[in-house]
Amino acid sequence: MASLKKSLFLVLFLGLVSLSICEEKKRENEDDAEDENHEEESEEKRGLLDFAKHVIGIASKLGKRSEEKRYHPFGKRSEEKRYFPIPFGKRSEEKRYFPIPIGKRSEEKRYFPIPIGKKKKKK
């Protein structure tokens, strides 16, 4: 009877040891799988963060651009043109303020599309 008890305890002990070893390996595998999932999630989060930074950068550039257009509707210029938007010089001012030639004939053409003058007689 004593030998049966010893053999039974031996089998029980070996079974428990092998069971604990298997459970330990299973936990390690689960931990590895969780680590891999965590790494993938962190990579996805990093990708989303990079994408979000990119989108925010574009939005800020568009905001700056609209603000520039608000104050400088023709884009950035050199310092002189920024503070003196009217071009200097007689010729450029004439072009700016008098885009239509100021001759009598040109005014007639502009305001009277029908030719004024003698009518040609048909025979």
Curated annotation (Swiss-Prot):
Keyword annotations for this protein?
A: Amidation, Amphibian defense peptide, Antibiotic, Antimicrobial, Secreted, Signal
State its role.
Fallaxidin-1.1 shows no antibacterial activity against Gram-positive or Gram-negative bacteria. Does not inhibit the formation of NO by neuronal nitric oxide synthase. Has no effect on splenocyte proliferation or smooth muscle contraction. Fallaxidin-1.2 shows no antibacterial activity against Gram-positive or Gram-negative bacteria. Does not inhibit the formation of NO by neuronal nitric oxide synthase. Has no effect on splenocyte proliferation or smooth muscle contraction.
- Please report the name of this protein according to its UniProt entry: Preprofallaxidin-3
Q: Where are the transmembrane segments?
A: none
Coarse class of the primary localization is secreted
Q: Which family does it belong to?
A: Belongs to the frog skin active peptide (FSAP) family. Brevinin subfamily.
Using the UniProt annotation, give all residue ranges assigned to the region (Disordered): 26-46
InterPro entries from the xrefs?
Answer: Frog_antimicrobial_propeptide (IPR004275)
Subcellular location as annotated: Secreted
Q: Which residues carry this modification: Leucine amide?
A: 62
Q: Which Pfam families match?
A: FSAP_sig_propep (PF03032)
**Which residues does this entry mark as bearing Isoleucine amide?**
102, 116
Q: Which GO terms of type biological process are on file?
A: defense response to bacterium
Task: State whether keyword Signal applies.
Answer: yes
Give the pro-peptide residues. 23-46, 66-70, 78-82, 92-96, 106-110, 120-123
Q: Which residues form the signal peptide?
A: 1-22
Phenylalanine amide-modified residues are where?
Answer: 74, 88
Q: In which tissues is it expressed?
A: Expressed by the skin glands.
- What cellular component GO annotations does this protein have? extracellular region
Which intervals carry biased composition (Acidic residues)?
Answer: 30-42
